[in-house]
Each structure stands twice: as structure tokens, then as C-alpha cells.
Amino acid sequence: MRQVLLNIVIAFLWVLFQDEDSFKLSTFFAGYLIGILVIYILHRFFGQQFYLKKVWVGIKFLAVYLYQLITSSMTIINYILFKTKDLNPGLVTYETTLDNDWEVTFLTILIIITPGSTVIRISKEKKKFFIHAIDVSDKEKQKLLKSIRQYEGLILEVAE
């Protein structure tokens, strides 16, 4: 948070040093870019990672989630239209490495809002998920577990 505020201050100082008659967004943006460069060079002195890294992880997370959402939605549509007799619903267990309550909650929400699966129960230790899936054949089960591991990895990356 300190890095963002410092970057905004650098951008405003840049605007002031330009000695223009009116505030121009382009000048502020140029100052913000200069601030990014300065903060990137000096971020080691803050004792934190560079703040735009989290922004990049957030964008990557959003892209992965949207991809998973679209592909799982297409799979569910395919099941509904063509494979209603081939459904093999069941329970899948998944052991997580997440520690914080918010991380576990976030993973649970991601599983629930992805079509075709829902979390039925979480163990008392908050380490094991019991997930109901629309198809638990080996291939579909592996796809589900792969997407959950991918979510979990991104959550850990954001939590760093």
C-alpha cells in the first residue's frame, strides 16, 4: 500500500514540476510511469515485493478463472444436450495445502461458482474438501483436480 501511495505522490510531484497552466492526465500518467520505474529500482528498501507483481498475478488469476469458467460451462452444456445418460455424479475428496481461513474460503467459492462442482463439506482441520461433481469418471475427475490445484497455486501466489 505504501508503494502505491508513494507512486501517486511521485506522479503529483511530476505534474507540479512540469509547471503547466492546467492539470493534464497525460502528464500525471507520465509521472506515474516514472514513479513505477523509481519504485521498482528502490522496492528492496521497502522490505516488500514490488506492488505491480500482485497486479500481474491478479490479471493472470482472472484469465485462468475465466478460461476455467468457459470450458466448464461448455462441458456442462455438452452433458445437458448430448450426454444426459452418461453422467456419473459422485464425490471427490481433495486435500489442500492452504492455511489461512480466507484462502480456504476463496478456494471454496471458486469451486462452487465453477459449473459442475460444488463443495459439500470441509473437514474440521480445513485441509480436506468433499466435492460433488457432475461426472467423476477418471478423465473428468483428473480435470477437476487439475483445475483446483491451479486455483490453489494462484491463491498461494496472491497470498505471498
From Swiss-Prot:
It is found in: Cell membrane. It holds the Pfam family MNHE. One of its GO terms (molecular function) is monoatomic cation transmembrane transporter activity. Keywords: Antiport, Cell membrane, Ion transport, Membrane, Transmembrane, Transmembrane helix, Transport. InterPro entries: Cation_antiport_E. The chain crosses the membrane at residues 22-42, 61-81, 102-122. Its main location: membrane. One of its GO terms (cellular component) is plasma membrane. The keyword Cell membrane applies. Signal peptide: none annotated. It is a multi-pass membrane protein. May form a heterooligomeric complex that consists of seven subunits: mnhA2, mnhB2, mnhC2, mnhD2, mnhE2, mnhF2 and mnhG2. Belongs to the CPA3 antiporters (TC 2.A.63) subunit E family. This is Putative antiporter subunit mnhE2. The gene is mnhE2.
